[in-house]
Every structure is written in structure tokens, then in C-alpha cells.
């Protein structure tokens, strides 16, 4: 029988993160852990997560499998738990069974064929910046009431996030000495939809450093991880650029 145990905190973060862009996902179960990739209906944003076996306190798998679920139903289960609880999850034919203390709840699985798993494109760029998640979120929040787009600029000496409208302007400027790492041979800039970017960044609950890679008018890649009991869960956001006239 497929059976696993995971903390409520980590399950909630996984589900909330995926829920920023989709309502249904398909998890791929392998002996070394679980992976999931989702893309929003407009094909603007993509999330990819790798959840290693050691992120679970228990992980028993009869054979490789795929499980498609309605995220809102999983959220309803999570709401029954306390933040320090552990949820035991098992597959029972066409249902997913959750055990939380004295509560047992089952939800119907979706047809695997009804949920597609997108291919993760290769986004290659030698230009990147590593900074704290909180610094990026502050810059995005400052721009929230200015415009629906934000322009990221990377130079060999700094990283900035700027948003402008006819009447207002917001800019976050981080010089090289305030960044954890930077790689840039010549200035690059690209604009992205602010709503998507802020929603994705806010869904990362930890304040670990994140890596942003992009090129001028090119998709944005954000690599991050968040803590589990034993081994970090790693993830990547991809976001299409906002083309400017």
C-alpha cells in the first residue's frame, strides 16, 4: 500500500504554493520522492516542486504511481489539523485517505488523464542574483499599488525592481554589497506581470535565499527551497515576460 506521513506545515505550504496558479495537480510518486509540475491556464506561470523521500517521516511506495487531486479538497483536510500535526496519507483504490489524529477523511482522486503535466522548459541564463526572499517581497509589495508590471534590472553592480505609472513610481535598489551573490557581464532588464510574481513569492513561507535568473525579454526563473523535518524541499517558479511596446 502507498502510505506516507508529512507535517501539516509542509503539506500546507506545498498545496498553497500550487494553488496560486492551479486548482488541480498530478503528483508523480517515485521511490526517491514526489515531484509535481503545474502551469496556469494562461500559460504565464509554472511551478515545479521536488519533495525528496526524506522530507517525509514515513514513505512507503509499492510501485511508481501518479495521483491527481483537487487542491481545494486537500485544503479542506488541512484545515482540520493543527500546525504541529502530522498527516498520514494513503491511497485506497480511487480515493486518497488522510489520517489526522482521531480524524479519518477520504477524498476522490481525479482521473490522471484529466490533469496534464507540462514539460519544464530549459531556461538557461548565466545572469543571476541571489538575495533574501524578504528583500524581494518588500520591493514587490511597494510596487503593488503603482502598476500591474514590474521591471527587473541586473547590472554587474546592482539589482533593482521598478514599477511606474502616469502618476506614481516605486523602486527597490540593492547594491552588490547587499546581495548574497551576483553574476552579470552586462546590464539586462525585463518586465514581468506583478500579480503573478508577488503571489508566487508570498507563497514561500521561509525566508531562505532565492536565486533569480533572467535575460532581457526572457522568462524569469526563481529557484528556492523550504525546510522539512530532515531534507529541504526544492522548487522553481518560471514566469513569462511582459512584452513592452
UniProtKB/Swiss-Prot annotation:
Pfam families: PCNA_C, PCNA_N. GO terms for biological process: leading strand elongation; regulation of DNA replication. The keyword Manganese does not apply. InterPro entries: DNA_clamp_sf (IPR046938), Pr_cel_nuc_antig (IPR000730), Pr_cel_nuc_antig_C (IPR022649), Pr_cel_nuc_antig_CS (IPR022659), Pr_cel_nuc_antig_N (IPR022648). GO terms for molecular function: DNA binding; DNA polymerase processivity factor activity. Keywords: DNA replication, DNA-binding. It comes from the Archaea. Belongs to the PCNA family. Sliding clamp subunit that acts as a moving platform for DNA processing. Responsible for tethering the catalytic subunit of DNA polymerase and other proteins to DNA during high-speed replication. Homotrimer. The subunits circularize to form a toroid; DNA passes through its center. Replication factor C (RFC) is required to load the toroid on the DNA. NCBIfam families: PRK01115.1-5 (NF002222). This is DNA polymerase sliding clamp.
Amino acid at each position: 500500500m502507498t502510505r506516507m506521513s508529512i507535517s501539516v506545515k509542509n503539506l500546507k505550504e506545498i498545496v498553497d504554493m500550487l494553488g496560486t496558479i492551479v486548482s488541480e495537480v498530478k503528483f508523480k510518486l517515485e521511490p526517491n520522492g514526489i515531484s509535481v509540475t503545474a502551469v496556469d491556464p494562461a500559460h504565464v506561470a509554472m511551478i515545479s516542486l521536488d519533495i525528496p523521500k526524506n522530507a517525509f517521516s514515513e514513505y512507503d511506495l509499492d510501485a511508481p504511481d501518479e495521483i491527481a487531486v483537487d487542491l481545494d479538497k486537500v485544503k479542506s483536510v488541512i484545515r482540520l489539523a493543527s500546525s504541529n500535526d502530522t498527516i498520514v496519507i494513503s491511497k485506497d483504490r480511487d480515493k486518497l485517505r488522510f489520517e489526522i489524529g482521531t480524524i479519518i477523511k477520504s477524498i476522490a482522486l481525479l482521473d490522471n488523464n484529466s490533469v496534464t503535466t507540462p514539460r519544464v522548459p530549459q531556461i538557461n541564463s548565466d545572469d543571476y542574483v541571489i538575495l533574501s526572499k524578504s528583500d524581494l517581497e518588500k520591493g514587490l509589495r511597494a510596487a503593488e499599488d503603482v502598476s500591474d508590471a514590474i521591471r527587473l534590472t541586473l547590472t554587474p553592480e546592482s539589482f533593482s525592481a521598478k514599477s511606474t505609472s502616469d502618476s506614481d513610481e516605486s523602486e527597490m535598489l540593492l547594491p552588490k554589497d547587499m546581495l548574497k551573490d551576483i553574476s552579470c557581464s552586462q546590464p539586462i532588464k525585463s518586465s514581468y506581470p506583478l500579480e503573478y510574481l508577488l503571489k508566487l513569492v508570498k507563497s514561500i513561507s521561509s525566508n531562505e535565499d532565492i536565486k533569480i535568473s533572467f535575460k532581457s525579454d526572457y522568462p524569469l526563473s526563481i529557484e528556492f527551497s523550504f525546510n522539512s523535518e530532515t531534507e529541504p524541499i526544492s522548487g522553481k517558479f518560471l514566469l513569462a515576460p511582459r512584452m513592452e511596446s
